[in-house]
Amino acid sequence: MKTALVLILATATLAVAYPSSTQDYRVVADKTFLTRQRDFLRLLVRIEQPNYYADQYEVGNAYDIEANINNYKYPHVVKNFLSAYKRGMLPRGVPYSPYYTTQSYETKLLFDLFYYANDYDTFYKTVCWARDRINEGQFLYAFSTAVFQREDLSDYILPPPYEIYPYLFVDSEVIQKAYETRMSDVHLTAPKTYIFPVNYTVANPEQELYYWYEDVGLNTYYAYYYFNYPTFFNETEYGVHFDRRGELFYYTRQQLYARQFLERHSHDLGEVEPVHYDRPFQTEYYPRLRYSNGQEVPPRPYEYSRRSLYYSNGNSYYYGNYYGGNNNYYTGNYYTGNYHPSYYYGYSTEHDYYYPEDLQIYDRRVLDSIDYGYVFSYPDHKYPLYEDYTKGIDYLGDVIEGNGDTVNRRYYGSIYHFYRQLAGKNVDPYNDSGFAPSALQNIYTALRDPANFHILKHINSYFQRYKGYLPRYTYDELVFPGVKIENVDVGKLVTYFDYFDVDIDNVVNVKVAEDGKYVDYRARQTRLNHKPFTYNIEVNSEQATDVYVRVFLGPKYDYLGREYDLNDRRHYFVELDRFPYKVQAGKTTITRNSRESSVVSHDYPSFRTLLRKVFDAYEGKEQFYYDKSERYCGYPERLLLPKGKTGGQTYTFYVMVTPYVKQDDHDFEPYNYKSFSYCGVGANHKFPDDKPFGYPFDRVLYSQEFVTPNMYFKDVVIYHKKYEEINAATVQQ
């Protein structure tokens, strides 16, 4: 899925230096590809049930991992996994969280088994074996990450997670209706479609944003980010390099927060307060989700939202992930080198103990490092934050995320994840009630909880403190001599709500594969969309040159109607696009469509559609094409614009043209880098951009000295219309 490292380029006759964004990179799938694609899809059908495809079941049943130890790159990977498996891992049917230490450790062991399989045949037999023996949540996480990371699997398509495991994406009331319908239609003999509307009740202002928080595409983007950049991945162990990984962590979180801010802005809501370990938590949350075993995703009622991360009597607390039996004990050193769990995670207990005092200590250490100018490693080595800004923010981002490349996990912890863990267990801090993992403790649901954005605001404050110490960009650094933007023309910007059907067939059990063909259950959700728009940029240049075009959208007025100072609103500008272009001497008009954005991905093909097309192609009924330029990871194209207003809402459309500085001999070859802005460029590739992410809004600025001829600010108005109005206008056209 990572082959599609492509950068969307402007379509104009003058842009001959780069591939066209309309170029067709589709490839006709051969029999080998179709066989493997079909097998991947079948593996993911009703993953909480035993596999009812007999051939895959037999492959898994007959396979002996230990007897095939030489078919894996490293024998110790097999030994480590089997040692944990024989000792006892998370049982099937138990809710899973990749942020519980023990469960995360087990998932890494399983991923390593998949990742280090020497060839496809070994990989396939291993996943068939694991499909019915490993917890379904762990299996899905490890399998998906392996497909994203293995070079030999890069072209294969995974169905969207909201259709593999709908429980964490669709209202539990709808799931219940699907159960009841299935019970009344046990003996289906022909296909029958049922559509279950997802209804929302807005009980407080925060819930007005339900359509954004609960957008299945947005939450899929967040999950795919972690499949692209697994938290446990590190360069030393896996021998791969993630270019600007720490900076990308910062930028994606900053942009998510800014996009949520713009969505709040469209509802005249103010900015959220940052979370803090010793202050009351303000946001209640009722997820209306439940796991496949029937356990509810825990809510956070108002009375618990009002208390701080300290326990109500002022004492500290921990949370645990104990799930019974002997599964919670890990005493052996299953990692090699420094990657024993107690070393990597900083805790050596079978429970995950997190004290608010720990957060206070980690918080102080990060702030001290920013102020001092160094992050500290083992035993006495230190890495400078301000000598090379690109490396400095990378070090800082790795430290705050606490990923596998952090210079010192023991010393700095993982502030981002620790805050989510503590806030997520706020209702049941001692784990007395045995609650399932909360929304904040799962990659598929974290963005649904508004609390995540309180945490993001706090996380962003570290980076803003760091950026505040960097020198402001000077006029000479910002200007592009000989290049001027003379005008920007933006088409009409219109948002609307439409309807989207999520295939929820996988929530109901069937006995044989044939029965599954007749089950067609769909949850119909309301989602935000916008009409595609085009903008034209008129550039005048003294000579032909390669340029980089950067496009942002930001608020012009605050929620009280007061015009922002540019420096005050720079944090809220969201990136709409970033692309190279070759301008000619004299005047060049750059035309760009919103669907070409390097930020976004488009709707994913549904599970049902993929199954039908692949099976038909496998049987010779039609051809199946896969797109080598498609990444399937990116911000949803539908959400590129914040919701408008009936009478319109004014925003600032900002364009900047900078010199294009080639970073790698393979920049933009052979494809475009689709959705690289928010999903990176994957392992062992360089970002095709020499500027900091978010440039030029990433540093403090003086409004009077900021504007240069190669920039252009344009007031635009975003309107919101009813779906019927959009349809009527389309028919008239």
UniProtKB/Swiss-Prot annotation:
Pfam families named in the record = Hemocyanin_C, Hemocyanin_M, Hemocyanin_N
Q: What is this protein called?
A: Hexamerin
Q: Could you tell me which Gene3D superfamilies the record lists for this protein?
A: Di-copper center containing domain from catechol oxidase, Hemocyanin, C-terminal domain, Hemocyanin, N-terminal domain
Chief subcellular location? secreted
Q: Which GO terms describe its molecular function?
A: nutrient reservoir activity
One GO cellular component term, please give it.
extracellular region
UniProt keyword annotation of Signal present: yes
Q: Keywords of this protein's UniProt record, alphabetized?
A: Glycoprotein, Secreted, Signal, Storage protein
Q: What is the lineage of its organism?
A: Eukaryota, Metazoa, Ecdysozoa, Arthropoda, Hexapoda
Q: Provide the glycosylation site positions.
A: N199, N234, N431
Function of the molecule:
Larval storage protein (LSP) which may serve as a store of amino acids for synthesis of adult proteins.
* Membership in a protein family: Belongs to the hemocyanin family.
Intracellular or extracellular location(s): Secreted, Extracellular space
Q: State whether it acts alone or in a complex, and with which partners, per the record.
A: Homohexamer.
Q: Which residues form the signal peptide?
A: 1-17
